[in-house]
Amino acid sequence: MPSFDVVSELDKHEVQNAVENAIKELDRRYDLKGKGSFEFKEKEQTVLLTAEAEFQLEAMIEILRLALVKRKIDVKCLETKDAYASGKEMKQEAKFREGIDKELAKKIVAHIKDAKLKVQAAIQGEQVRVTGKKRDDLQEAIAALRAKEFDMPLQFNNFRD
């Protein structure tokens, strides 16, 4: 029986490259030179942004987003927390999310059921397995999921006939 998996994954190496590109861009920007820094924590997949003022943090977030787009990483996976003061500096944390949580998985399954396609969707941990009798039905399910905007980027892998 044909099936595929709906997942949300990040290429960690590309994320690291994007953060390094953002650091280089920060050094090149005259208005931010020496006033801010990015600190990438690879294990937690977070970036700590430090600047003198909140408007500089906003500019740094925009630099990071542009670097992600250049590396073909969807910016929906970047979750920014509120800025906070730490001494004379402002700090903000940005976290890279991956994996489909239960709430999003339920939305995906509900969307597939609402589309009234001849497929079944089942939640399996951090992925959703979609099975059907025909390959065409699965391709319709992929098209239906791509047409709807979810708050996480979705990838389709493990397509089997």
Swiss-Prot record:
InterPro entries named in the record: DUF520 (IPR007551), UPF0234-like_C (IPR035571), UPF0234_N (IPR035570), YajQ-like_sf (IPR036183)
Function: Nucleotide-binding protein.
Source superkingdom: Bacteria
Keyword annotations of the record: Nucleotide-binding
GO CC, any one term: cytosol
Official protein name in the record: Nucleotide-binding protein PputW619_0959
NCBIfam families (alphabetical): PRK05412.1
The organism of origin for this protein: Pseudomonas putida (strain W619)
Family: Belongs to the YajQ family.
Matches recorded under Pfam families: DUF520
Positions of transmembrane segments: none
GO molecular function: nucleotide binding
